[in-house]
Each structure stands twice: as C-alpha cells, then as structure tokens.
C-alpha cells in the first residue's frame, strides 16, 4: 500500500492547517500540518518501516503511542478538537485530541475489549457510539464528547445465544522464539 491511505482534512476553524494520517512512526497517527506557503521548505526523513518520506511545512504529531487511529469522525469546532476512533489490540474506543495542546481526552486504559464505530453530530458535541463485546452483541449509546460519558442508552441487544451453552472466550499472548515478541 502507498500513503496516503486517508484523505487529508482541513481544520474548519483554520483553513491554513490540515490533518494528515500516517504510519511514519510505525502506527497510524494524526499529524497537524501548516499549509502556509511560506513554510513549505521540505526535507526527507526515515520512517519506522524502513522507507523514507518527504515533509514540507511545519508539522506536529498530535497522537502517539502503541495504538493506531482507525477513523477520524470529525471535529468539535468550539473546543478545537478532533474526534477519532483508535484501536490497541482487542480494545477500541473514541477519543478527542485538542489541536492546540495535543491533550487526549481519556487514557486508553479506560477502554474495554470491544469493537467501536461512531457517528459524530454536526457540532461535534455528541456521538452515536455503536459497539459490541465478546459477551454483548450490540450496544448503541449517545455519548457526550466533552467527557466521553454515556448520556443515553439507545439499544442494548439481547444475546441470540441466551439459553444455549456457549464456550467461554479467552484471549492471551504467546511469546515468539526470541522471547520478547
């Protein structure tokens, strides 16, 4: 595959800056670029996967860690935040990153083993969070993006396996021959 895999997104409150997703550090993360033509001198850098990339203009890495951004849902223009979905192993969740200071709304440790998808309101204030876990087939909540707390449960689906004897699902890790991975 060749980057960019995702379209760039200009900040609604500042048309000279845009968000670019890249795996240049080994994980898909968000980068803030300044599109001001006076800052477009470029340099070539080495990426984590052994390739190189050319970078023009000022850049700031907004998200960082051993997890990846899976989807940019949109913006909260009032708080100048980017709302996104991120994945780490079997855990996923929705987050906001402040463009000014790079602060992320909540720690990844708050996320449970689950698969999330979302739809953001036009204002970026509320989010329809759809998710499932190994024990729960579907939950849909209305979430306030200020604190990512549920404000209303819209659906908690009944398990289609109710009344059946089901195996328990367990996850774990196995070390490779090198003993570290």
Give the location of each predicted region.
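Peripheral, non-catalytic segments that deliver or gate enzyme domains
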Residues: 1-181
